[in-house]
């Protein structure tokens, strides 16, 4: 079946390319105001350079697309065509600052059409508009002072997770376990679902959604895009069932108005006094669950990878975490004060996020014609900023491939150079939430085990986040009591 689709897709792409060839070249945007367009090529008609953009990630080198063109054109801004759209790629801290500082002035958020199709809004608004609504709703929930009450809960979930998934096992595959851990926390914190069977039922379709969100938007059976659309419908139906039950529980006094984001959404009206419908809430919870577990699960997986490869770094994390263990009474849960003591551990996690950023970059759209660095950017062009353009740039981070947590001592890296959570008004509101679940994971991991990689040279693929090709199998060595 898969072999059948290869020639079929090739013919489909060829037909589309030829059909639109004339239209594409007649409608190419031109420079204005006397400034040239950025240097670069737009690749094949319609397809553009989408394949090169995606395939370098599939091969484990997402930065290659960026750095090859930066070198070729001797420029921090270059043009391309991705997902059928003319685009400019902005590279470096100065470019990041420009884009982040001009959010909703010169640029606005943009997602490929595949995102809107995987996450269709029940209110007929775009994913961009839905995200704006969510960002207005979430800040209070994700403030550090609000998240403090969830630290003990995360600690309990982590303890249960390691007892059931790691202990008494010689080998484990890390990435699926990390996904289970972060998804379990997201389900509990966002919708108060914690029954393992119910969590597992929701988790299964999420892998397909994550793989298909940023993919070639061909909706044919067997494609990642088709699988993502089907899986999102399955999850949405399950979430509507959870929402209906919560409404009943709230009415009967069995649920609290402040217990989680779901209750907050059900009981909060907009400026006109209108409450969100069940489908609308399901859409938003679906997006939260994706964002609330995917990036952290990738980060936790790479923490395990790097600590296996760097015994001296492991030892530093172990010593710090054991000091916290020794300060606790038997059965006492982690508190905010304990998290604040995990300074070296968080430096290590930040270095992991620098070298393997779950968010490789993000798109913006030009709201009007503007110029930057002597180049004209036409209205409607898509703009892409890249984390790797600063994270592994030797001008920003000396010896960029060296793992060095001390980069984050003191004031840390230069502004706009370390961007695993984005920046500006669109910085991920769940940054502090992710910090907590990563540190709690590290605490439980190192106090229980040392480990080694089963596949020393395991390949890394990026689709759309970095993931070890085999899920990172490791051999566990429990600490002696």
UniProtKB/Swiss-Prot annotation:
InterPro entries: Cyt_P450 (IPR001128), Cyt_P450_CS (IPR017972), Cyt_P450_E_grp-I (IPR002401), Cyt_P450_sf (IPR036396). It catalyses: beta-amyrin + 3 reduced [NADPH--hemoprotein reductase] + 3 O2 = oleanolate + 3 oxidized [NADPH--hemoprotein reductase] + 4 H2O + 4 H(+). The chain crosses the membrane at residues 4-24. Induction: Expression is not affected by methyl jasmonate (MeJA) treatment. Influenced in roots and leaves by relative humidity and soil water potential. The keyword Mitochondrion does not apply. It is a single-pass membrane protein. CDD domains: CYP90-like. One of its GO terms (biological process) is sterol metabolic process. Heme binds at residue 428. Mostly expressed in roots, and, to a lower extent, in stems and leaves. Accumulates only in the rhizome of plants. SUPFAM superfamilies: Cytochrome P450. Pathway: Secondary metabolite biosynthesis; terpenoid biosynthesis. Its EC number is 1.14.14.126. Its cofactor is heme. One of its GO terms (molecular function) is oxidoreductase activity, acting on paired donors, with incorporation or reduction of molecular oxygen, NAD(P)H as one donor, and incorporation of one atom of oxygen. It is found in: Membrane. The keyword Chloroplast does not apply. One of its GO terms (cellular component) is membrane. Keywords: Heme, Iron, Isoprene biosynthesis, Membrane, Metal-binding, Monooxygenase, Oxidoreductase, Transmembrane, Transmembrane helix. Component of the oleanane-type triterpene saponins (e.g. ginsenosides or panaxosides) biosynthetic pathway. Belongs to the cytochrome P450 family. PANTHER family: CYTOCHROME P450 26, CYTOCHROME P450 716A1-RELATED. This is Beta-amyrin 28-monooxygenase. It comes from Panax ginseng. The lineage of its organism: Eukaryota, Viridiplantae, Streptophyta, Embryophyta, Tracheophyta.
């Amino acid at each position: 079946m898969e072999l059948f689709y290869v020639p079929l897709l090739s013919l489909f792409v060829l037909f589309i390319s030829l059909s639109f060839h004339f239209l594409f070249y007649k409608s190419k945007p031109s420079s204005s105001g006397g400034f040239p367009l950025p240097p670069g090529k737009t690749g094949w008609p319609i397809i553009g350079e989408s394949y090169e953009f995606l395939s370098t990630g599939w091969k484990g080198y997402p930065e290659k697309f960026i750095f090859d063109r930066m070198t070729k054109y001797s420029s921090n801004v270059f043009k391309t065509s991705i997902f059928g759209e003319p685009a400019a790629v902005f590279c470096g801290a100065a470019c990041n600052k420009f884009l982040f500082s001009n959010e909703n002035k010169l640029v606005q958020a943009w997602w490929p059409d595949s995102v809107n199709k995987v996450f269709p809004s029940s209110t007929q608004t775009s994913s961009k508009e839905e995200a704006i609504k969510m960002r207005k709703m979430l800040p209070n929930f994700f403030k550090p002072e609000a998240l403090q009450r969830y630290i003990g809960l995360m600690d309990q979930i982590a303890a249960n997770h390691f007892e059931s998934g790691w202990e008494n096992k010689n080998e484990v595959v890390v990435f699926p376990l990390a996904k289970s851990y972060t998804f379990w926390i997201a389900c509990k914190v966002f919708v108060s679902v914690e029954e393992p069977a119910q969590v597992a039922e929701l988790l299964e379709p999420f892998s397909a959604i994550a793989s298909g969100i940023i993919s070639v938007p061909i909706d044919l059976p067997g494609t990642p895009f088709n699988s993502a659309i089907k899986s999102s419908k399955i999850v949405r139906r399950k979430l509507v069932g959870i929402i209906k039950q919560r409404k009943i529980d709230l009415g009967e006094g069995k649920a609290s108005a402040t217990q989680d984001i779901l209750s907050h959404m059900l009981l909060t009206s907009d400026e006109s006094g209108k409450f969100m419908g069940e489908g609308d809430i399901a859409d938003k919870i679906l997006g939260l669950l994706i964002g609330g577990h995917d990036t952290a699960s990738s980060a936790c997986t790479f923490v395990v990878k790097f600590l296996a490869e760097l015994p001296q770094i492991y030892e530093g994390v172990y010593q710090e975490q054991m000091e916290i263990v020794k300060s606790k009474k038997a059965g006492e849960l982690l508190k905010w004060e304990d998290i604040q003591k995990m300074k070296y551990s968080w430096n290590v996690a930040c270095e992991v996020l620098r070298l393997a950023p779950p968010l490789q970059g993000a798109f913006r759209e030009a709201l009007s014609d503007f110029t930057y660095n002597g180049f004209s950017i036409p209205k409607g062009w898509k703009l892409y900023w890249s984390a790797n353009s600063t994270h592994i740039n030797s001008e920003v981070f000396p010896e960029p491939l060296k793992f060095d947590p001390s980069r984050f001592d003191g004031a840390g890296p230069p502004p706009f150079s370390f961007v695993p959570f984005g920046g500006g008004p669109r910085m991920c509101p769940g940054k502090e939430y992710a910090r907590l679940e990563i540190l709690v994971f590290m605490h439980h991991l190192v106090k229980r085990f040392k480990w080694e990689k089963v596949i020393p040279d395991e390949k890394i693929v990026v689709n759309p986040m970095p993931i070890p090709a085999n899920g990172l199998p490791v051999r566990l060595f429990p600490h002696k009591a």
